[in-house]
Curated annotation (Swiss-Prot):
This protein's name: Biotin synthase
Database matches in NCBIfam families: bioB (TIGR00433)
Binding site for [2Fe-2S] cluster: 98, 130, 190, 262
Region feature Disordered, mapped onto this chain: 317-362
Amino acid sequence: MSVMRNNWTKEEIIAIYNKPLMDLLYEAASIHREYHDPNVVQVSTLLSIKTGGCPEDCGYCPQAARYHTDIEGNDLMSVQQVKAQALRAKSSGSSRVCMGAAWRNVKDGPEFDQVLEMVRTINKLDMEVCCTLGMITENQAHRLAEAGLYAYNHNLDTSEEYYKEVISTRGFEDRIETIANVRKTNVTVCSGGIIGMGESIGDRAGMLVALSTLSPQPESVPINALVAVEGTPMEEEKPVEIWEMIRMVATTRIIMPETQVRLSAGRMNMTREGQAMCFFAGANSIFAGDKLLTTPNPDVNEDMKMFEMLGLNPQKPFTKVSQPTTVEAKDSRYESLGEKPKWSRPSHTIEKNLELSGKGKN
């Protein structure tokens, strides 16, 4: 029987990651079966409710306003548009809808009120609702919880050390603080990262240390393979090899046994065989739909064919945590405080991010 731990060291995690592959897979698959049904995989749909125009400089992201990419910015979707997309996702087999907005942080006002109504609407469809909206305060987290939010996503992206090579417009500590604010409510935490950004194996282990030492550990950990987008500072990074993804999934499963490990961005470059190995290694959640915010993703019908081929079943909603109750806006205990929190603005610069900022296409 595996033991839940919150004191993993970087050295221990590197040693696990570098095990002979057959030993690594056997250990990960054995632990996976202790805590989860190996033939059940959660299907989530990621919906970009507000695209582009983000003031941040995340080196991997085509939604940053400072980079010249082919992304077309869109204003916040309406509640009815979101409801229609959620119903479509539900009919395709998704049990969770994750709404993403390209914001640095949530600001109190009409747009946030609209997002809260989206959360209420989707929760009433008996689907898990997740949001990724940037940094949030404790009061904003409580307002989301009252609306019926099931999960809040805020990825650490990478290790604290390598983070400074990826993003200069906010600090790693802001990520941790946002997760802490979510933990003051009944909302579950979704937090993971990206591999393939030029980081070392030590950095991958460092990210897993940061995640696994959170108490409690995140209920969901997305593992993304970088999708290099033209116009971003990471446009020339080489694609992640499937073996790296398998090792990362397996290592995550071993050190966080109860967590749902989500096979996220980068699946377009993975064969069915590669994805099957990831499921065997402990991945038990995917994002479905033709796009992940702005990057291509396998068609949901193709995913369902893969599920049938592998004998996998989509997970039903609220399997891990019971459905939250929706409190209507008029009955809410928490109101807008008009907060203007002082999130950090690190003073360092990242040369390749600066080079791409404001540079037009030839």
